[in-house]
């Protein structure tokens, strides 16, 4: 397995966070296909060319393991350092057209949307994630609660990450997506076991009344390419 070093990942993360006057973006394409292996093989091979053509920071694929909105869904994601970078791209520039022409897998594009990245984490080669779609009337209070929860989880030895996105287009506009993850599935599972503990429930109770959980799902993600730093 090709390993993405923590140093490189850290540089990518710091690059995202350094844009004080910019807003990082995730472009997310939801694809439905019966040939998951074929689609993943194409994405892995084409990703280095696609991120270069689109000025993306990174690109990869996530596949639900439970809770998928539709069986056969997969999520092709790209990270951009700013809205400006994301918007200046032609979705079907010559390189994209050329690479898509190589894809011989039957598939349906169910959605193609942008998500604001409001909490970033270092990237890993592969990871396991528990995601929630949440509606909230107070994003700042909710983010503060999530920050407290992540800090306490880590303080108690749970080596997890917590990415947070806000939908910017499509039916998920304004929806918050929380993605708690780990490089090891058992590590993520242990962190989820902590939900039964008093300290966890106390932290969640501080923001539970300000949110409505819409949908939950689990997935496995792979990073296929990162821009040179």
PLM region descriptions:
Residues 21-229:
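Short S/T/G/P-rich N-terminal loop/turn motif that feeds into the first structured element of a domain
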Residues 1-11:
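Bacterial N-terminal signal peptides that target proteins for export
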Residues 15-19:
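N-terminal signal peptide c-region/cleavage motif recognized by signal peptidases
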């Amino acid at each position: 397995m090709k390993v993405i070093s923590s140093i490189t990942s850290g540089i990518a993360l710091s690059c995202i966070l350094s844009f004080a006057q910019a807003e990082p973006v995730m472009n997310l394409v939801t694809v439905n296909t019966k040939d998951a292996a074929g689609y993943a093989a194409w994405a892995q091979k084409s990703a280095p060319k696609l991120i270069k053509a689109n000025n993306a920071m990174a690109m990869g694929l996530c596949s639900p393991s439970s809770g998928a909105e539709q069986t056969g869904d997969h999520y092709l994601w790209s990270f951009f350092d700013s809205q400006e970078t994301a918007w200046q791209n032609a979705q079907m520039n010559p390189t994209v057209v050329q690479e898509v022409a190589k894809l011989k897998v039957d598939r349906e594009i169910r959605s193609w949307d942008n998500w604001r990245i409001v909490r970033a984490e270092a990237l890993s080669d592969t990871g396991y994630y528990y995601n929630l779609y949440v509606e909230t009337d107070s994003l700042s209070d909710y983010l503060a609660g999530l920050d407290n929860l992540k800090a306490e989880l880590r303080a108690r030895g749970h080596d997890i990450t917590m990415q947070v996105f806000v939908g910017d287009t499509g039916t998920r506009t304004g929806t918050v997506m929380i993605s708690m993850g780990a490089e090891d599935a058992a590590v993520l599972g242990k962190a989820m076991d902590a939900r039964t503990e008093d300290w966890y429930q106390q932290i969640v109770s501080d923001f539970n009344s300000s949110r409505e959980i819409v949908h939950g799902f689990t997935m496995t993600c792979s990073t296929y390419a990162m821009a040179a730093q």
